[in-house]
Amino acid sequence: MGRSLKKGPFISDSLLRKIEKQNSNDDKAVIKTWSRASTILPLMIGHTIAVHNGKSHIPVFITEQMVGHKLGEFAPTRTYRGHIRDKKGAR
């Protein structure tokens, strides 16, 4: 279930300020953020945002197809190491 249209998309205030500052200076430095719940807006296209996954920051380059999604969708929090093998082997 999505967010109400009258409220608009959520984006962290500090993240929005950093992006607007870089857009005005034509700067494309990596922006670190812990705000995984922030929605990707069209003004973020072309920026690289380092999203925290609980352990480290994962760099995410924003493209047009990502607009409307959340930042956390592109920084997985769990590592999949495969299913456990049968220790007894084939009999």
UniProtKB/Swiss-Prot annotation:
Gene Ontology biological process: ribosomal small subunit assembly; translation
Molecular-function GO terms, alphabetical: rRNA binding; structural constituent of ribosome
Keyword annotations: Ribonucleoprotein, Ribosomal protein, RNA-binding, rRNA-binding
Keyword rRNA-binding: yes
Function description: Protein S19 forms a complex with S13 that binds strongly to the 16S ribosomal RNA.
Family statement: Belongs to the universal ribosomal protein uS19 family.
Protein name from the UniProt record: Small ribosomal subunit protein uS19
Source species of the chain: Prochlorococcus marinus (strain NATL2A)
Protein encoded by which gene: rpsS
